[in-house]
Structures are given as C-alpha cells and as structure tokens.
UniProtKB/Swiss-Prot annotation:
The DMAP1-binding domain mediates substrate recognition. It specifically recognizes a conformation-dependent protein determinant present in acid hydrolases. Disruption phenotype: Decreased mannose phosphorylation of lysosomal acid hydrolases, craniofacial and cardiac defects. Impaired development of pectoral fins and otic vesicles. Craniofacial defects are due to changes in the timing and localization of both type II collagen and sox9 expression, suggestive of an accelerated chondrocyte differentiation program. Increased level of active cathepsin K (ctsk) 3 days post-fertilization (dpf) because of abnormal processing and activation, leading to morphologic cartilage defects. The gene is gnptab. The chain crosses the membrane at residues 27-47, 1180-1200. Glycans are attached at residues 88, 119, 153, 292, 381, 462, 554, 610, 617, 645, 696, 726, 823, 974, 1021, 1029, 1094. GO terms for molecular function: calcium ion binding; UDP-N-acetylglucosamine-lysosomal-enzyme N-acetylglucosaminephosphotransferase activity. Its EC number is 2.7.8.17. Disulfide bonds join 443-466, 457-473, 508-531, 522-538. This is N-acetylglucosamine-1-phosphotransferase subunits alpha/beta. Catalyzes the formation of mannose 6-phosphate (M6P) markers on high mannose type oligosaccharides in the Golgi apparatus. M6P residues are required to bind to the M6P receptors (MPR), which mediate the vesicular transport of lysosomal enzymes to the endosomal/prelysosomal compartment. Hexamer of two alpha, two beta and two gamma (GNPTG) subunits; disulfide-linked. The alpha and/or the beta subunits of the enzyme constitute the catalytic subunits. The alpha- and beta-subunits are generated by a proteolytic cleavage by mbtps1 protease at the Gln-893-Asp-894 bond.
Length: 1219
C-alpha cells in the first residue's frame, strides 16, 4: 500500500511539473487528441475484424426490409431488390400528354392518306372488337339471325335456293323482335358452331339484302331484347371433370338423353346446351329436375335458353376511346402489392418504383428502403422521352443506379399470395426458374409453330412472316427431311413432339399439340380422355378412366385389349423411380413418357394399326437406391373392335379416306360407280357356331382372368345367354390363341433344357442353329432383332440429362417421312382450312387472347391507341404495295401479339427455329448482366423499341426476349477449360492417367488398345510438327512426368490446344453447353385473373384465389370504368385486397396524411429550395452564435488571447555592455 501511494504521489508531482511547463498544456492537449484518435482507430479495427469474422450475421441476412436475419431460410445470401413500374392514370398532365400523342398520330395518319391520294379526313373502317357479354351463362350459339325476316312460307329444304351456305341448317324459326313486335327476324339453327361460322362467312357474300348476325344464348331472362328458344335448354350442375361431350352423354340419365337430339358441351363454362325434340320436353325435364335428376351425386339443373343477337343492347362496347380520368383510374394495386412484399418477401433489400415523374399520394418517401426513379434517370437517349410505351420503359429498368445484380421485376397488379423465397426464382444448382404459359401466336393463320421447319413445305406457312416455313419451302428441304421437331433437334427445353409414325403430324385432341404432352403443364386442351389427361401432367384424379397395367418383375409381355389407345403402367410396387428409359421406335407410337411423381409410365397410341409389339428398356431405382434394368414388351392392336347390331358399308381397300373439307370442286357423278358400291353391303354373319379357343387359362394375364371371372358370373346370374357368353369369351381369348401355344412350347422346352447338362445344351443349340442355316429359316421369326431405341421423357430428369437422352437420332423416322411426303403435305394443306374454322378452346392460362394485354400502362390495357396504330399500319402497307406491286403485308390484328411474333422471328434467326411459349404474367427475376448482354446482341432492335412513343408491333418484349435468350445462349467450347478439367492435379502436364481420361471422353467405350495408341501417336506427331513456342515443351522439366512410352512428349496445354486432330475430336465429343442454367417450371403457383365488369364472375374469381392461394397472383384490370357495374366491381376488388393484406406496410403514410407533392419535378424544386434555405439558415445561426459569444465573453477572450499570444518582456537589468 505504501508503494502504491508513493507511485501516485510521483505521478501527481510529475503532472504538476508538466502543466507548469511553458508548453505543458499543449502537450497534454495533443496527447488527449492522440488518445481519442487511437481509440477510434482501434474500434474501427475491431469492427472490421468482427465483420470479417461474422459478416454473414451482420450484413447479408439482415440487409433487408424486415431488418432481421433469415439465415435459416435463405439459400442465396445476395442482395435482391425489387423494381416496380407504375403510373397514375388520373393525372391531369398525363391525360394532356396522351391527347397530344393521339393528335400527333392522327396527323401522321392524315399525311399518309394524303400521300396515297385519299381524303385526309376519311377513316378506313377498322375491325371492331366484339363487345363483352356480361349476362350469366352467355355463349355464342349455333344460330344465325337474318334481319329482315325471310318469307313466312319458306321451309328448311328451300333455304339452299337462297344461299348454298344454308344447306346445313336444321331448323328455321320466325321470331318477333322484342323491342319491335310488329317486325320479325329469322333464326336458323345449325348442328354445330363450325357449321354456323362457315354459313355466316359464306352467306355474307350471297345475301346482300339481309343483315346476318351470330346468335347468343343466355339464361338471364331479365335482360332486355331476349327471345326464348323453346327447343333449346341449358343443363348445368354436372361435375367439372367431364371435359368431353361423349363422357357427359354416357353418364346422363336416360330421361335426359331420350328427350334430346343433340348435346353440346361448353366445358369452360361448365354448361351443356340441349337440343330438345319438342317444346314439351323442356317442361318434362324441369319437372323431373325438381323431383330427382342427379349425376354422380350432384343435382342437375335445367334452365331456359334465351336468344339475342344485338350485344350493344346488352352490354356497353369497349371501343370508346374518350380520354377520361375514370378510364385509366388507379385502384391502388401498388399499395397492396407492397404489403404483400412486406408480408411474404421481407428479405428484399430495396424497392425502386419507376414512374414518369409521378409520386403515389400515400407513399412514405422518408422510408430508406423505397426510392422513386424517373424515366430521365434511366433513359440513355433523352430524346426518346416522353414515352407512353411499356416495352420502351422496361428496356431501361436494369440501368437504375444502385440496383442489385439480380432483381425482381413486378407490375403493380402483381402480388405475392404465399411466402416466397429467392429459390423460387433462382438456385445455384438448377439456375433460373422459368415459368411458361401459352404458345406464341402463330406467325400466320393456320400455321402452328410445330409446322415450322419440320421438313415439309406447308402452304399456310409459305410466306415471309413465317420465313417461308423456316426454309422448308426453299431448296431441297421442301420435299421433306430431318426437321426441327424431331428428337434431338432444337433446344434442351424443347420437348419431343412425338415418337414414331405420324405422331408428330396429328393431334390427339383439337388444339392439343403433341409437344404439349408431358411438358409439366396441365394443358386444358390435353386434359381429356383422348389424350390420356395430358399423360400425367393433370394429376391422377382421372387415371381411373384409363386402362391400368401393373408392372411385375418377372413378367416380360403385356397384352392390351384390341382398340385400347391410352394405357398406363404402374410401378408403385416395383420401384421408387425410373432413372432412364428407352422405347423401340414404332409407327403406332404417338407419345410415351414416365411420371415419377405418380410412379406411372404412360403410353398413347395411334388408331388403326395392326397388331405389333412395343419394346421398353427401363432402368428402375429401388427404395434402397439400387438400379436394376427391366426389359418388357407390350402387344398392341389399335384397330377398332367390330360393333355389334350395326351394319357398316364396305369401304374399298384401295380408296384413301378423304378429308371432310368443303371444296369448290363440282360434284362427282355416280354413273361410273358400280351398283354394288353405291350402297352399303349387309354382312351375313352367323354367331351360332362360335369356336371358343381352348387355352390354359392359368397362363393368361390377370386382367383377362378377371374379365373371364366376371363373364362367368354374368352367365350364372342369367344376365347373358350362352351365345353371348361364347361370343365374348372367344373375343377375349382370340389374341392369346397362337401366343398360348408358343408359351406352352417354350415352357416345355425350358423344362427339358434344364434337365440337360451344360455341354449337352451347347451342343443342341449349335446343332439347331446349323439346321436352321441349312434350311434357310428365319431365326428372327422367333426372336426378333433388338430394335433401335429412343429415349422416353421422364418428368423429374434434369435439363442436362434430358438433352443428353434426347440427343439420339431416330433411324426410322426419316425413312417414314420420306415415304409419306406426298400425301401428308396435301392433307395438311387441306386441313389448315378446318384448323381456322375450328379453333381450340384453349388452355387454362395457356392460350393467347387479344384481351390478355401484358402492358402495365392503363392506356395499353384499354387499347387507347390501338385503332390509330392499326390504321397507320394499314396505310403503310398500302403505301408499300403502291410502291412495289409485288410486296404483300400482313394486316395488323394486335400489337402485343405482333411484337411476340417479331421477337420470335429474331430468336429464330439467332438461335434456330423452334416452338416457344410466353412467360407467365408474374414477378420475374432479372440479371442485369444477362439483360445487358441481350441488348448488346440486338442493339438496333432495343434502340428502336426505346424510341417508340406508344406500343408498337416491332417492340422487344421484355420477359419473352430475356428468358429465351437466357435459355438459348450457348457457351462456345473452350479447349483450355477442357484441359484444365482433365488436368486434375493442376500440374499443367497430363499424366498417363489423365491421358486415359481424355481418351474416354473422345472415344466410345469400351476403350481399345488402338484408341490409346492412336491418341498417343497424334500427340507425338503434333509435338514434332508444332513449334516450341506454341507447345511450351521446353519449359517442362524432363523429370516432371514419366510415361510408359519413352517417346511420349510432355502433354502440355499448348500441345493439346494447337494439335488439330486432338481439338477436332474434342469438339466432336464435347458439345456446346448452355451458357446459363435454367429450369422449366409449371404454373401450379400462378393465379392469373382477368378482371372484367361482370360482378358475379369477378366474385367467383376472387373466391377461387381465397380457396386456393398461390405464390404469384395477378389481377389484370380490364374493367370498363364507364359501365354501371364498374363501381361495384372495384368495391369487390378493394374488399378482396383488404381481406388479403389488411395491415399497412412501412412504405405507406398514415391514412390521414398524403404527400404534398405528386410529381418529382415539384419535389426536386422544393428540395433545392429547402437545401438553400437550410444552408443560409445555418450560416445565420453560426453568425449569431459567434456574435453572442463575443458579446458575453469579451474579457475572457481578451485574456485567452493574451495567454495564448503573450507579449515578450524586456528585462530592466539587462545591459548589453555588461560583461
């Protein structure tokens, strides 16, 4: 203690001594400052060290909207921002600019008309869009309405005298006009929509004195101008799973089918139209429905059908082009979309809202996580502004300052419905996740994308818009050949459209392309029995309607019933999954694929083929992850079974079936046709003495045993007679008559062979082979040659594996196409007309509709400039035709669809012809570097898109062009990278082991000694012929690598790169890989709803989202805001938003506040004024503080000055002369 006190006193004394020194105070102050600075530096070093050690905890996972760590959920610790594009359609300044742009377009149109020598004020009549029907169960019926009415005494048989188009009419009705009962119209009923559509098109040319309209049917009897159809009725209430007319007809009660002449199913509306025999039948059906009329436990409802033909009297037209605030009204979708981000995606780092300078009135601009970006901030060429085109704006959003490399782009009408994570968009293992929907619109009418570059010159595709059928109509390729739609062609994401025969040329259902089957999308057009319910894509609910076969380990032959086209094989009890599958190419195959999700193998067959066998080679993976290979055959016979109790005319064997397409050719006279061929022949067939095959029933398949057991039960119960029993049993056992004898003989030979010794067996086999060679027998009759195998598509095989599997050529396909090139081209050309008339019903979320407008700007959704753009394009086309008589142009129908076709043509020219689909309307994750690379690839096209003031037919569609560039870009093979991959020890020189690895990569397995010696000889020859400055052999130590062959030089990277024979083999063995990884996703998590003005329909759409929440929700506003029900629809929509996201987000101001400025220019001017005011205010405050201090502490300041700067004192005793 004494020592401590002594040290303290010493420290005190030294401190006083230092302070009493002349410069002691300065030293103390300097030491204090140095200590503070050192403390800060030390703290900074500590923080940096802690950040380096715990940067994951401090930065990546907490740098987000929520400000908390998502370390347990995020798989990508990278910052991800969100970009919105938003506009306020009710802004007065914006409406003025829109009027100015429209006026400018009208002036350009007027100038074009003057150049053509036409009246500048004359407007060409443009095709107007059909108004929307807002009535309940409103459908277009098979009815034509003629105004004024035909003579009252005319009959249906006399209609062809007026016009040949009416020859297919089945009924004629004289109907009084509801609003004018004194006058009437004539309603013509047809059997189908196709007949009505064709009659409408043809009658417009013949009957110029009558107005011909299509008739509409509805159940809403309260609407004005309706006429009840007594022989038509609506049927509803049946299960929605019934997608085909025949399915519904079979299940309907007899009381309904007995009173109907025809049934038409509208699966999209879940209703059916009944053509009744008499008017009394409707009364009987309604009474029966009140008692008991059910189908699969559901009550059926029969309703009256009301006819109307004037849609303008029912609903208001959507062609009103007046510029009004209500037309482009904002429903505050952005507010609720931001709430969905805070609720379901709080890991987002920052939110950028791109506007034309507008500011949402409710947006909290003080929030550091949100920023408003104007067009001036991102457009490189300011002369392109102002712009009212969404593609032009989207072209520049990746140039936002401070934007993350990967960002998510959303429109304001898109939001999240469930928790979303970055791996929903991108993962390091599989790359970008691409969500695709409906196909790109056809390049020309009647020319689907699957016809382009398929080896045939198709008439409908032989035009400039389709690049002359992708080259099929130019040169020798027009006569057939290996097209782009066969397996192995196209991109890895392009699935095979079929296997053998005509599978790629005919569809299993109207509107269901073969390439849509098993493509991981549930296509509505393919979700029917004829297509096997999209072969597993639409779940397993309807698999019970297909023929099921259970695979067994020890069974190698399965036999299908005659006429069966849609079987599937279940391996649930056999293995866990299928890792690889091959099938022998066969003409009867339409499609086959594996669905590991349901543990099934699906098979679709073409009808009308004789008995044959399909051979499978499947690699299964058991539950313990051990692979085993199973080979089996399927015996098929797709000819239809003969129908009993019916007589059919005998068709001449040499006659080819003619397509049922109406042609203007004259009728063929029947004088030259023999009498025996002018009528049907009655086949006299007696069933009295039916020969039932006697077989060993224990060897029959289980399915046949079950059918025989049921047949015996029916006979014992008296349901069938002996004759029927024998006839049915003979039909069941007929396919196994010859097969059973061969099976028994094979089993017997097998038993005898097992009794012999191995030497005796070998001697017998050689003797048998020798005898067969001497007699010239064909051994292949008993054991067929293993056919060429093609890979089978598997649902969960990765993209890389799929491309590897599908890179196998089909040797029989080219020969088959060459044989059928003549008649197939003719059939397709004739069928194209039928394809135009009978449009497919489309796919849910996968069909193009002109109302499905992808622009986020409200005037694009309302098609405000559409009429002007169509007129300008028509005039430009006419001007081009005037200048060049040989030029032809395609009439613009829809700007968005034409821009898709335009981009598709560019992609075809850059990456090759293939079928493409449009990305879903949902949030898209974009990589800035990839987007910049895309724009560097098409610089002129993107610059042209940026220059368009309004949407144009030659715009580069943002998501479509980006994702297909990402999926199509190819990484050129780099020999240096291949060398580095093989050089596993990174020594720069390949060893003997590594040379063998190289040999396995460039040669087929198994390797032979000749393969290795030839490779070594190539390297030796190249080392002698190439200069040393290329091979760098002199830089390698002689002892670095020792080879078995002493003459072998060191295999350096330079030697491999410059050795031409080696590089050629490497290029042949190593294919160019995709530059970017990607994964095709389904649409299970996407909910796209087109919100129109029908209140009940909108409520049903929103309730569907409530019941089935999805991750990505888009409510596309297509409301007619001037309609009387628009307010109700918007209220329902607002109520839905509030029910989904009731809590305000941090990006909103309180409800009682709103932004003072609604434009960025006003805000920026105010901020400049604020900053200036703040600067001068600070200056004044500093001045006041200085004067105040000087006034109150004047004496102290003088003393401080004297103390800091003391005067020098002159000593009185100092005498310079004194020594």
């Amino acid at each position: 203690m004494l020592v401590v006190n002594s040290l303290l006193k010493l420290l005190q004394r030294q401190t006083y001594t230092c302070l009493s020194h002349r410069y002691g105070l300065y030293l103390c102050f300097g030491g204090l400052v140095l200590m503070i600075v050192s403390a800060f530096q030390f703290g900074e070093v500590v923080v940096e060290w802690s950040r380096d050690q715990y940067h994951v905890l401090f930065d990546s996972y907490r740098d987000n909207v929520a400000g908390k760590s998502f370390q347990t959920r995020l798989c990508l610790p990278m910052p991800i921002d969100v970009v919105y594009t938003w506009v306020n359609g009710t802004d007065i300044n914006l409406l003025k600019d829109l009027r100015a742009v429209r006026q400018r377009l009208e002036e350009e149109q007027k100038a074009l008309r003057e150049r053509l020598g036409k009246n500048g004020s004359e407007i060409t009549e443009a095709p107007k869009g059909r108004p929307e029907c807002l009535l309940s169960h409103c459908i277009m019926g098979p009815v034509l309405v003629l105004d004024p009415a035909l003579p009252a005494n005319i009959t249906v048989k006399e209609l062809p005298t007026l016009s040949a188009a009416f020859s297919s009419a089945k009924e004629l009705l004289q109907v009084a006009k509801p609003l004018h009962p004194s006058s009437s119209v004539t309603a013509l009923l047809f059997h189908s929509h196709t007949e009505a559509e064709k009659a409408h098109a043809d009658a417009l040319k013949d009957l110029l004195t009558h107005s011909i309209s299509r008739g509409y049917l509805t159940t809403d009897k309260e609407a004005p101008g309706l006429v009840r159809m007594h022989t038509l009725a609506y049927l509803s209430g049946f299960p929605a799973s019934l997608k085909e007319t025949e399915q519904l007809r079979v299940k309907l009660p007899a009381v309904v089918t007995s009173k109907t002449k025809k049934l038409q199913l509208y699966s999209e509306a879940s209703i059916a139209l009944l053509h009744l025999n008499t008017a009394q039948d409707f009364t009987d059906l309604t009474q029966q429905a009140k008692k008991n009329l059910t189908l699969d436990g559901k009550e059926l409802t029969v309703s009256s059908a009301f006819l109307f033909w004037d849609l303008t009297a029912i609903s208001q037209s959507k062609q009103d082009e007046d510029v009004s605030a209500s037309r482009f009204e904002d429903n505050e979708e952005l507010r609720y979309s931001l709430r969905s981000i805070e609720k379901h995606a709080p890991w987002v780092r920052h939110i950028f809202i791109v506007t034309n300078g507008q500011i949402p009135s409710w947006l909290n601009l003080d929030n550091p996580r949100v920023s408003v970006v104007t067009h001036q901030d991102i457009f490189q060429n300011q002369t392109h502004l102002p712009t009212f085109s969404s593609p032009a704006i989207e072209t520049h959003i990746h140039r936002i300052p401070g934007l993350s490399q990967k960002f998510i782009y959303l429109n304001d009408d898109v939001m999240f419905g469930k928790d979303v994570w970055p791996d929903d968009f991108y993962s390091h293992s599989k790359g970008q996740k691409v969500y695709l929907t409906w196909p790109v619109p056809n390049c020309a009418e009647g020319c689907p994308g699957s016809w382009i570059k398929d080896g045939y010159c198709d008439k409908a595709c032989n035009n400039s818009a389709c690049d002359w059928d992708g080259g099929d109509c130019q040169g020798s390729s027009r006569f057939g050949g290996a097209g782009g739609s066969v397996i192995g062609g196209g991109q890895p994401w392009q699935f095979a459209g079929g296997l053998g025969g005509l599978a790629g040329m005919s569809f299993c259902n109207q509107g269901c392309a073969n390439s849509w089957l098993a493509d991981k999308f549930c296509d509505q057009a393919c979700n029917v029995l004829a297509c096997g319910f999209d072969v597993g894509d639409c779940g397993q609910d309807n698999l019970n309607q297909l023929h099921r076969i259970v695979l067994r380990r020890n069974q190698t032959l399965y036999t299908l019933p005659q006429g069966e086209l849609r079987p599937y094989f279940s391996f649930s009890g056999l293995a866990n999954r299928v890792s690889e599958a091959h099938v022998a190419d066969n003409q009867v195959l339409r499609h086959t694929s594996v669905a590991n999700k349901w543990k099934t193998i699906h098979l679709l067959l073409l009808p009308g083929h004789n008995a044959t066998q399909i051979h499978y080679n499947i690699t299964f993976q058991s539950t313990d992850h051990h692979d085993f290979i199973m080979t089996f055959s399927v015996s098929v016979d797709t000819r239809e079974l003969p129908k009993s109790n019916t007589s059919t005319p005998v068709r001449d064997k040499e006659e080819e079936p003619k397509p049922t397409v109406a042609t203007p050719e004259p009728e063929v006279p029947f004088e030259a046709v023999p009498k025996e061929k002018q009528g049907p022949k009655v086949r006299e067939q007696t069933h009295g003495d039916v020969q039932v095959p006697v077989l060993n029933e224990t060897l029959l398949p289980d399915e046949v045993k079950i059918e025989l057991k049921k047949l015996n039960e029916k006979l014992m119960s008296g349901d069938i007679t002996i004759k029927g029993f024998n006839l049915t049993k003979a039909m069941l056992l007929e396919p196994y008559k010859e097969k059973d004898q061969f099976t028994l003989k094979h089993e017997k030979d097998k038993e005898e062979k097992q009794k012999l010794s191995p030497v005796a067996q070998l001697q017998n086999e050689r003797a048998a082979a020798r005898v067969k060679r001497e007699k010239g027998e064909n051994v292949d009759q008993l054991k067929p040659v293993a056919p060429s195998l093609v890979p089978v598509q598997i649902d969960d095989v990765t993209t890389k594996a799929q491309s590897r599997l599908f890179n196998i050529e089909k040797p029989h396909m080219f020969h088959l196409l060459s044989n059928l090139k003549g008649n197939l081209s003719k059939e397709r050309d004739s069928d194209s007309e039928g394809h135009l008339r009978e449009r497919p019903t489309g796919r849910r979320l996968q069909f193009y509709s002109d109302s499905l407008n992808r622009g986020f700007l409200p005037w694009e959704k309302r098609k405000f400039f559409q009429d002007l753009m169509e007129e300008v394009n028509r005039l430009q086309t006419e001007l081009q035709y005037t200048a060049d008589r040989t030029a032809t142009g395609r009439r613009l129908q829809d700007t968005f669809a034409d821009s898709l076709r335009y981009v598709n043509r560019l992609l075809n020219a850059q990456f090759g012809f293939t079928s493409r689909k449009v990305p879903a309307h949902m949030p898209h994750m974009i990589d800035r570097l990839i987007m910049q690379e895309l724009q560097d690839t098409f610089p002129q096209e993107f610059d042209k898109t940026s220059s368009h003031r309004v949407r144009h037919s030659e715009d580069m569609q943002f998501a479509f062009s980006y994702f297909y560039f990402l999926m199509s870009a190819v990484q050129q093979l780099n020999i240096s990278e291949v060398f580095d991959e093989i050089d596993t020890d990174h020594s720069g020189v390949l060893s003997d082991r590594e040379i063998r690895t190289l040999a396995t990569r460039i040669h087929e397995l198994p390797l032979s000694l000749q393969d290795l010696t030839s490779l070594e000889q190539m390297l030796i020859n190249c080392s002698k012929s190439l200069p040393s400055n290329l091979t760098h052999l002199h830089a390698v130590s002689p002892t670095q690598e020792a080879y078995y062959d002493p003459s072998m030089p060191p295999v350096t990277k330079g030697l491999v790169i410059h050795c031409k024979p080696i590089t050629e083999r490497i290029h042949k063995a190593f294919k160019d890989q995709n530059k970017y990884k990607f994964e095709i996703m389904g649409e299970e998590e996407i909910a796209f709803k087109m919100i129109r003005t029908n209140v009940s329909h909108v409520v049903g759409q929103l309730d569907d989202i409530r019941k089935n929440p999805r991750k990505f929700i888009c409510l596309n506003d297509n409301i007619d805001h001037i309609h009387k029900d628009a307010g109700t629809v918007k209220a329902v929509l607002r109520d839905f938003y509030e029910s989904m996201f009731p809590l305000p987000s941090q990006f909103e101001l309180p409800r009682e506040y709103r932004n003072r400025f609604l434009h960025m220019t006003e805000l920026q001017e105010w901020r400049i004024y604020r900053d200036k005011l703040k600067f001068w205010t600070h200056c004044v405050l500093v001045t006041l503080v200085v004067f105040t201090v000087m006034s109150f502490f004047a004496e102290q300041l003088v003393m401080l000055k004297r103390w800091l700067f003391p005067r020098r004192r002159v000593s009185k005793d100092a005498n310079p002369e004194r020594v």
